[in-house]
């Protein structure tokens, strides 16, 4: 009886193991955004009140200067190549310039007024791809 149960379990396990398709893409969370870096582009980012978000720059970059049009409604914490951001007030829109040891980044940042947690355009992580 024990062998029969073990046999059924193994058949079920093997069948399910082969049903996984390694060529199907993994689901991507829309709140993690990757932008193609272009020095002539302004990147638009929307943040949720009370949530921490991160802007990640290239691995060989370090933040040197951050300038905000209206700094009051934002909490910023730079750490090496990452900039941690938190919106403090709803419905605020301003610009931000980040200068690293390699590049200049221009942003238009906005704090969300919606209470919908599933808003697609909210950014939790912003990363950059650098074409050669």
Each model region followed by its residue ranges:
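A general "mature secreted/periplasmic domain" signal
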Residues: 18-132
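Positively charged n-region of N-terminal signal peptides that target proteins for export
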Residues: 1-5
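Cleavable N-terminal signal peptides
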Residues: 6-7, 17-18
